[in-house]
Each structure stands twice: as C-alpha cells, then as structure tokens.
UniProtKB/Swiss-Prot annotation:
Keyword Acyltransferase: no
GO biological process, one term: arginine catabolic process to glutamate
GO molecular function, one term: succinylglutamate-semialdehyde dehydrogenase activity
A Pfam family per the record: Aldedh
The protein's role, per its UniProt record: Catalyzes the NAD-dependent reduction of succinylglutamate semialdehyde into succinylglutamate.
Sequence similarity: Belongs to the aldehyde dehydrogenase family. AstD subfamily.
Gene this chain is encoded by: astD
Record's protein name: N-succinylglutamate 5-semialdehyde dehydrogenase
Organism per entry: Salmonella enteritidis PT4 (strain P125109)
Leading EC class: oxidoreductase
Keywords assigned: Arginine metabolism, NAD, Oxidoreductase
Record-listed E.C. numbers: 1.2.1.71
Amino acid sequence: MTLWINGDWITGQGERRRKTNPVSAEILWQGNDANAAQVAEACQVARAAFPRWARQPFAARQAIVEKFAALLEAHKAELTEVIARETGKPRWEAATEVTAMINKIAISIKAYHARTGEQKSELVDGAATLRHRPHGVLAVFGPYNFPGHLPNGHIVPALLAGNTLIFKPSELTPWTGETVIKLWERAGLPAGVLNLVQGGRETGQALSSLDDLDGLLFTGSASTGYQLHRQLSGQPEKILALEMGGNNPLIIEDVANTDAAVHLTLQSAFITAGQRCTCARRLLVKQGAQGDAFLARLVDVAGRLQPGRWDDDPQPFIGGLISAQAAQHVMEAWRQREALGGRTLLAPRKVKEGTSLLTPGIIELTGVADVPDEEVFGPLLNVWRYAHFDEAIRLANNTRFGLSCGLVSTDRAQFEQLLLEARAGIVNWNKPLTGAASTAPFGGIGASGNHRPSAWYAADYCAWPMASLESPELTLPATLSPGLDFSRREAV
C-alpha cells in the first residue's frame, strides 16, 4: 500500500513500479501508480477537508507543522539513509538535505507572518485590514534531486496557509516521498489534508488536468514546466508556481587565489553530481595567463574526483546520478559538443557500466557555433574564454534561462555592473552558484520560472490577499459629496 488518500494507505491501481539504487541496483521500493480515478478521489477528499482545515486557527496548523519538524529531527538518520540510497548521493549530503527540511519549518512560519498573515492600519473612521486566504486544493509536483527538501518548500507553507494538498513525488524517488508522508501522518494531520499519489507521466497528467484544482506548485525541468503552463493556459483562476532549471554562467574574472577559485567552481558545477538547478553549466574564463593557470588547476583537481557509493568510507564528494540513463544522457551531451567542435579538457567517464557513477567532464566551446541552450543535468561543465568584462556579461546573458549567475572577482564595481545587467534571479559574488538562503526568495526569470519564486516568497503563492475597510458603526459623513442633499423635506 503506497498511496495515502484521506488518511488511509491504499494500493495503487495503475502501472507497477519499482525503484532501485542507481549504483548497486538493489531494489528499494515497489508499488503501483495511482490511476486517474484514485487521483480524482485524492482531489475530492482534499476538497472536503479544506473548509475545516482553513478555519483552524493558525496556531493549530503551526502546532502540527512543528510536530512534523520534531519527527524529522527524531528520524533524521533514517530519512538520511532513505534519501541517500534512493538518489545515490553520499550520506553526508543527504544529511544536509534533512537538516534543510527541519530548518524550513521555522523559516516558513516567519515568512508566513512577514509575507502574508494579517496587518491592520487604523483610520480616522475605522480601519484598513489586510488578510490572506488559502487558495484551496493545490497539487505539488516534487523533483528527484532533492526529493525531501524541495517538495517540503511547497508543502509546509501551503499547509500553514490553510490549503489542502495532493503530493506527487518524482517517479524516481517514491520511497522518499512515502517516508516523508508517514512522518506527516504521525504529526497528526487530519484525514484528507495531505494526500500522496505515486506515479509517472500518466499520474501527473491526471493530476494536472483536474478541473477542481485551485493551483499547482512544480519543481522540475523546463520542458515539463512548459507543458504544465500550456495545459493550464486559459485558466487564470488557478495559481501556477513553476520552479525550473537553468543554464547558469559562472564568470572567472580575477583569480587572486587559484585554489579558492577552483574550490568555488567545483562546488558550483559538480556538487550533487551536477544535479542542482543552480549548478554552473557555463564557465566563462578571462583570456590570459591567469585564466590558463586557473583552468589547468581546475582540470587537475576535478580529474581526481572519484564518485562513490552513498555509504562509502571515506565519503566521496559526489555520488551517483539518479539513474544510469541520466549518466548516459550526460555522455551523449558531451559527445555532441565534441562533434560540434568542442575541445575536451577533461573527459567524463563511466566508472562502471550499468551504474550511474560518472566522473566530471569539462569541455571548451570558445568560438563553437550552435551549442544547444539546454540544461544538461549532470557533471558536465562548458567553458568559454572572453577578452573583456562586457563580453563576459553578454555571454552570461546569452541563454533563454535566468536562474543563477556568479562572479569571481576582486572588483566590487564589476559586481555592481553585473547586478545591473545580469538576467538571473540569483547573482552571487565570490560565492558558489549553488549557495542559496531560505531566508531569501529562490527563483529565476525566462525559462527558469514564471515569476513565482519559492523559499522566503513561497508564502506569496500559497495565499491570496483580501483587503477590507472596516468600521464597527455606520455613520453619515460630516461632509457630503457635491450634489448630495440629505435635508429633511417638510410634509406637504
């Protein structure tokens, strides 16, 4: 029984699915997808649960969410292992994901009050009050790269706001989704408030096409995000929050400390085996001896990165990709760039055929035409050389995406220029592109999203504002508008 609908664990009636570890092929989870009827049922029970949940005092909803945080803390080791085994990422990194999930609770509560909540201004003859109301029934689509943390970033603020939810994890991480939902169950969520449907494309299409949905919160690829946007076009009454990928540039302008710059680049490009939406995909390096030395050192250190199993001791910097197919896709993208005329500086290599273990790749594409503007979700870094800073900014903005951008430089004025000209929602200076704070909005422009940033701003898309002018008494104004005559006429 792998679906959770209306507080009950039930068996899916759709396609049979199993999840294996992407490195060892160990079977981790087996179950059936939700079929269209079960997806519709999840929506019906969420709709039925909505009025009571929305009318709960905020403190009551907060108490359940805080109980969930306590359960995350108590079961941190267990959830860490589930995430690591299912995604292939090392144990140390999975542990940081669970920590982020725990921290998200307090941050979301603060964001609720700062971004939404209730605000009142006294007027001479009454008050002006701003309140926020939940949308209703929302669908949450989770990704596989952070199968706990990223859905959590939608689910927690949505529940705090008073919405009821249908959660579909990535079909590549069903075990994590199920494990997290079992903690929500123990936290005491009323039946129907949060529902779990497992499945792939068919389940997702059944969910996104429901007429009775009030909105959809999505984290994933640009291609799927565009499909959802088309599917919900002509339905302005539904809230749609799209958090998509990036083809992110990192500019290396002035390298005062070569090893520090190399470390920042490794953290930007290859952490999580390159499977973060903010990962650097394009490395823009200034021409000259300093840039040459930096690239040589980068290739040297990156060439020593050996991906390993989730539980290896000592722990590796990177683990496996989500699947052997994902690793193969990275290899194909590298070969495509070589065929276009790219010069390989570090060839990616499959550590073991049939697994997702893949070493990083670096390829120079300076002067190469028709390089695809796409997000290759893995450890492949494309390099361009440039002559002057204005050219670097032009190259950085030469993408349909707009998620993250970074600069390594000792010149504050260059960073100020980048802030004015960059087309990205996250712009970092001498910090990894993959560094983002939950106390700030997270999102991008262009093909990276639809102007619904998450993290600190997630509260914004989880509730709608209601403005009121209020007075406890009805009185006639002391001064009437021109043309109004309220004088008493004597009876004839």
